């Protein structure tokens, strides 16, 4: 569990927010049940590095001027033109109470079906789970090694873990192997052009 330092914000002018961002920090807000919203700022690079290394559902200890809070990132706002972080939302979590979270699905292995020319499809990229904050995995692995052509891997096929509960429909498809795609080759035209009918000569019956 990472610990990041944050500073309390009391000035909400636009010019102040711009100064915060120009200094390499990102403004944010901490909120939660039975707690007042708290405006903060923290180093944007440290925050992004933590999320990249430990996953989006990691628990972060925010040290706000000496007072610590256990939080999760619930939203990140970015400027698409400048490609920079402009705001972050943090939710205070109770480490002893279960919460819902979306966790990425990571396919592992090379399926037999793909080796035989089949096409891998993955319609499900995240699983909804319920777990205590510290038990939320960075990702959930789905082994596709034994999948052959026309096989499917469903949520029910994933390994059962006691540390979290999966909320998705057990029959929901995680991955499947489609048959090889065959390109249709047009058959040559073997039909001969019809011959013109022969002209039929009529014999004149002129009394000769």
From Swiss-Prot:
Residues 186-195 have a biased composition (Acidic residues). GO terms for biological process: translation. Residues 178-208 are annotated as: Disordered. Residues 196-208 have a biased composition (Basic and acidic residues). One of its GO terms (cellular component) is cytosolic large ribosomal subunit. It comes from the Bacteria. InterPro entries: Rbsml_bL25/Gln-tRNA_synth_N, Ribosomal_bL25/Gln-tRNA_synth, Ribosomal_bL25_b-dom, Ribosomal_bL25_C, Ribosomal_bL25_long, Ribosomal_L25_dom, Ribosomal_uL5_bac-type. GO terms for molecular function: 5S rRNA binding; structural constituent of ribosome. CDD domains: Ribosomal_L25_TL5_CTC. Keywords: Ribonucleoprotein, Ribosomal protein, RNA-binding, rRNA-binding. Gene3D superfamilies: Ribosomal protein L25, beta domain (2.170.120.20), Ribosomal Protein L25, Chain P (2.40.240.10). This is one of the proteins that binds to the 5S RNA in the ribosome where it forms part of the central protuberance. Belongs to the bacterial ribosomal protein bL25 family. CTC subfamily. Part of the 50S ribosomal subunit; part of the 5S rRNA/L5/L18/L25 subcomplex. Contacts the 5S rRNA. Binds to the 5S rRNA independently of L5 and L18. This is Large ribosomal subunit protein bL25. It comes from Bacillus pumilus (strain SAFR-032). The lineage of its organism: Bacteria, Bacillati, Bacillota, Bacilli, Bacillales.
């Amino acid at each position: 569990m990472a610990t990041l330092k944050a500073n309390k914000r009391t000035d909400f002018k636009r010019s102040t927010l711009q100064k915060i961002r120009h200094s390499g920090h990102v403004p944010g807000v901490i909120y939660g049940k039975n707690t007042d919203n708290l405006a903060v700022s923290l180093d944007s690079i440290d925050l992004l590095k933590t999320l990249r290394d430990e996953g989006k559902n990691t628990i972060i200890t925010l040290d706000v001027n000496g007072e610590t809070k256990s939080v999760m990132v619930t939203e990140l706002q970015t400027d698409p033109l400048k490609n920079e972080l402009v705001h972050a939302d943090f939710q205070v979590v109770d480490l002893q109470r279960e919460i819902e979270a979306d966790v990425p699905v990571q396919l592992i292995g090379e399926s037999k079906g793909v080796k035989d020319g089949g096409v891998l499809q993955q319609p499900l990229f995240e699983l909804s789970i319920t777990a205590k904050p510290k038990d939320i995995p960075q990702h959930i692995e789905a082994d596709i090694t034994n999948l052959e052509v026309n096989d499917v891997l469903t949520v029910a096929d994933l390994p059962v873990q006691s540390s979290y509960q999966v909320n998705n429909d057990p029959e929901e498809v995680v991955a499947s192997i489609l048959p090889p795609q065959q390109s249709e080759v047009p058959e040559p035209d073997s039909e001969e052009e019809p011959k013109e009918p022969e002209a039929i000569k009529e014999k004149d019956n002129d009394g000769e």
